[in-house]
């Protein structure tokens, strides 16, 4: 692994785990009531800063000067780490082999999701019979999930407050066709009564952010059919809750540009192709070899601390420095499709909490159309992947579950589709599989 000074190693650890929301501003969470009509505050003139051109950035990057921090990867995490480092007074550089947010950070479901599924799965795991024999461990596991969800609520609030031009609240309706569900969602009998307790669950979800989100509420079947004429007639009621929504690629790109505005050296289409060691191959890493993918020019960049922020591609970066290292990241592929806007009328999304394979499936209003996703499949990440046709067909099939029989979702309705990879931590010492 990279050997660096204690001071810079600690900085790298802290920066590598910086959340996107922290990177874009102050740790301030407003406790006022939130309405759907967000007012964008009048900008304060604090002096215009000019972002250097890419050519100027590359010229600065190739001079051979040593940076305090060098970030590899221009997604949300990498851009956030670069901005955080630069704002802490560290001389920082960032490179991205493609365009900013062109991989994972631009291929999401566009939600600032606070983790309602984690709450549900946490309760399901806590109440499983086998955990009765290990109550302390079970409570500890649930506490970890709960703390993560609380943190997600806090970061969602910060991201919404700091980026009103890129974010909004989106209402999401959960239609219920029966008063009980069997087989039970998530494989736990308790969840068979989910339709009866769902409104209370959403109120609990509201409470986790101090009720600073628009309030969850019920919608009668008659009102639901007026708002969603395409719904099946046997829907008993609809429960509505709110999540944050944002333009993921623009959010990450704006963070990267803000880092450049604050003085960081930032360059896209610039790829790491090797490492530079202090005393041959046995010495510590003091820099990397870089290629400008537009001109083909190669040069060296030196840094005291290097952060790999390649998401699902991080193992590829690690192997340049340590060829025999074991995989630490697992890729989880997810496909999305975009349908015409009439599948999400009146700016309201839909959530299926009981798909045929037990996952959550969202139907979300997005730029005048309807975004549907996501699937989940474990596989090694590849750049710019194409969504498999069988997953597109599965999404279309699931989309019909709550729709009127008169409305058929056709393959020709798909306006666009994409696939992205979520990076999941993997124990390098665990056995294969």
Where are the language model's segments positioned?
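Core beta-strand elements of the Rossmann-like FAD/NAD(P) dinucleotide-binding domain
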Residues: 64-67, 294-305
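Extreme N-terminal leader/targeting segments of oxidoreductases
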Residues: 2-69, 84-88
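Glycine-rich FAD pyrophosphate-binding loop
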Residues: 86-108
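Flavin (FAD/FMN) cofactor-binding and adjacent substrate-gating region
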Residues: 6-9, 32-40, 176-263, 267, ...
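Short hydrophobic core segments
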Residues: 71-72, 301-311
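Glycine-rich Rossmann-fold phosphate-binding loop(s) that bind the pyrophosphate
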Residues: 73-75, 97
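Dinucleotide-binding Rossmann-like beta1-alpha1 core, especially the glycine-rich loop
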Residues: 110-227
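C-terminal catalytic lobe of FAD-dependent flavoproteins
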Residues: 250, 258, 316-319, 324-371, ...
